């Protein structure tokens, strides 16, 4: 019972985030960060709680899984997991994104599988599109500097607009979650895993 309640809370949170993100609209003013009103936030949470209450244990468990697939098109296995196990999301890797038009179609197929079965909950479609050397969606998408170069300018607008346009490109493909930016600090010169993915060595510069 405790484990089920914990899963339910996680699903409520995920649904609230997905619903909030889908309603942010165009963000052209700089800097502007979406601040949901208390009434809107309360309504979304209540909607998520009603949805979770209607889920079977299989649906509830499936919502905490984020899976991937090999190749350019969704495998029969991933589509089965979406329809029958009601997984919460799919991770897009570079090997899924060699053709952007095909990727867009594939995401549409997976979202249709999710929204035409069970409780019709849309998927989180996630990727890693940090800019710099971490860019899983290539093709005609923008080539941007790494975070270290952006941080060196000390211009928040550079960081803002880089993130804005990366987000717009991902959104046009149907990707609604980006595991970015990296907020680790640049603490060691030989920290090769982070390196230029960090904005700065100062935590206050990285996240003022």
Task: Give names to the regions the model predicted.
Residues 40, 69-70, 158, 205:
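Residues that cap or flank secondary-structure elements
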Residues 25-37:
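Signal peptide processing junction and immediate N-terminal pro/mature segment
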Residues 2-12:
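Bacterial N-terminal signal peptides that target proteins for export
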Residues 43-74, 83:
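Mature N-terminal segment immediately following signal peptide/propeptide cleavage
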Residues 79-208:
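Enzymes and membrane/adaptor proteins characterized by extended Gly/Ser/Thr/Asp/Glu-rich
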Residues 14-22:
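Bacterial N-terminal signal peptides
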